[in-house]
Amino acid sequence: MTANFGAIAPERGNSPQLRWINVVFFGVFHALALLSPWFFSWSALGLLVFLHWLFGSIGICLGYHRLLSHKSFQVPKWLEYAIALIGALALQGGPIFWVGGHRQHHAHTEDIDLDPYSAQKGFWWSHILWIFYPRPEFFDYDTYKKYAPDLARQPFYCWLDRYFLLLQIPFALLLYVLGGWPFVFYGVFLRCVLLWHSTWFVNSASHLWGYRTFDADDGARNLWWVSIVTYGEGWHNNHHTYPHMAKSGLFWWEIDVTWWSIQLLQTLGLAKKVVSSPPQGATHG
């Protein structure tokens, strides 16, 4: 990604308004997730663990983030689309929205107006309130697509960005057929809530706590427990220093599960042009 996204930065706008439909949507999912213990089964718990990894590590971390947002490696188009579909099923937004917002975050990290989830506005803002008080320039398609023109010109990504929410319906029906209500509650509601917070911790906790290996221009930090629940994304100081690298864990103790999957794809000949080291002479990204 070499485009100068700062040149199309959104204007510093007015105070955002609370969007109740977002509050109700996330509130209902959290309430239903709390009912999960009444539908417990060991198979449902196993499904939860598997889907948290599949949608979190493969769909979001590997797909939406390292592949689509930063282009740190390449895969065949059919595989790219399949991984993006898995990312859409994570219910964290369509690919154009997610990638566009993340690129805005990197272009204007911690700017209180231009970073969609600036940590300078506090833990809860960067964690979830940025969704409850949405700024049009971050949630309007015609605006955020400017940050992801490579995706916006592809019909598949436009379709996925529009209909990602509806994909949960056939997915939930499939889970019901396979395992009844326990699979629905653990595979949809509880899985969504846990994965949402796992991802949000990268925006909030990893900009507040942890250690800094590199003297980057922002407050991103390396936080071990966030890396556990996000499969390697918690090594955030490393990532903000070298955002186009396919791996975030740079030392042996910085476990990066998503990087293992990329290495497997590379071994199978499916991942090409993998960026596994900083650009020569680079100090930060």
From Swiss-Prot:
This protein's pathway: Lipid metabolism; fatty acid biosynthesis
Annotated domain remarks: The histidine box domains are involved in binding the catalytic metal ions.
Name used for this protein in its record: sn-2 palmitoyl-lipid 9-desaturase
Factors inducing expression: Constitutively expressed at low temperature.
Family: Belongs to the fatty acid desaturase type 2 family.
Catalytic function, reaction form: a 1-acyl-2-hexadecanoyl-glycerolipid + 2 reduced [2Fe-2S]-[ferredoxin] + O2 + 2 H(+) = a 1-acyl-2-[(9Z)-hexadecenoyl]-glycerolipid + 2 oxidized [2Fe-2S]-[ferredoxin] + 2 H2O
GO molecular function, one term: oxidoreductase activity, acting on paired donors, with oxidation of a pair of donors resulting in the reduction of molecular oxygen to two molecules of water
Organism this protein belongs to: Nostoc sp. (strain 36)
Subcellular location: Membrane
Cofactor(s) needed by this chain: Fe(2+)
